[in-house]
């Protein structure tokens, strides 16, 4: 039978691997007292689809309500031959209906996709060749057969196909995550090193992760290492650190610039203080009432006004010797300013100290 030859060939290809294997065709499925692997001795028991992989075994219990087909075939064969037909003819008829079903090709493709996950390219190519050979045999065997509609068989084929598609997704997900992790490590090594580092060939897909024997023979077991310039490594490390921490440095620079700008007074308020300074340059000591007025006009508090006048006098004003003597004699600054303005100690006319 073509189906038996196909399953024996595929099982031989996968005998040395650790990937999951499906048992849905061949002698395990349609021969003997157990039509599908994982079922009991009674062919009318609910169907159990079993998958094995790695060291773990998982059972997917799907009740397809398909034994009624077997009962119908068994009933028809009993009436035709008077009970002389065995269970083998019933199983062969059921197997023929499965092979002749339009969904059988899609079911086979889904199974082959599961087998190709993580397989080397040569193994994937052999699996594709086996699949094409089986499909050709299937077309030749279906030329003289009449395909009748069977809703229960349609339900079984669709459910089994969906299960294989989901199983392929589960097999592909960890392999894809591993490949993404290796690409990330490869990119980090390329940034730190001078020459590009290739952990695996990026052109290989999930179906061809392994390397062929020809590549290993041509390499001769030797790998040429590029010459490394220490200065190039320093430059690469510097660029890597700049790319990594440039955001932190720019944010820190902005924060420091904000702190520096925080000490500056508003432009309008500063201009009003400078105007008062120029008008009272001979004695730039505002009284408490003047400080209150300046605070109201500039919108600043008295502490800011006091600090501004202190810094302004330290940087831009120097009292005359007469004013210094008056302060040393204990005269109040305001009284000294009044005397100074009246010209008791200085001549009349405009005069700017410190000029």
UniProtKB/Swiss-Prot annotation:
Tissue: Expressed in the apical meristems, in the newly emerged lateral primordia in the floral bud, in their vascular bundles and in the cortex parenchyma of the floral pedicle. Also present in the lateral tips of leaf primordia.
Record-linked Pfam families: ELK, Homeobox_KN, KNOX1, KNOX2
Domain ELK: 236-256
Keywords from the named record: DNA-binding, Homeobox, Nucleus
DNA-binding region: 257-320
Compartments it resides in: Nucleus
Function: Appears to be involved in meristem formation and in the regulation of leaf morphology. Misexpression makes the leaf more compound which is always associated with growth retardation and loss of apical dominance, resulting in dwarfed, bushy plants. Probably binds to the DNA sequence 5'-TGAC-3'.
Family from the record: Belongs to the TALE/KNOX homeobox family.
Protein name: Homeotic protein knotted-1
Organism: Solanum lycopersicum
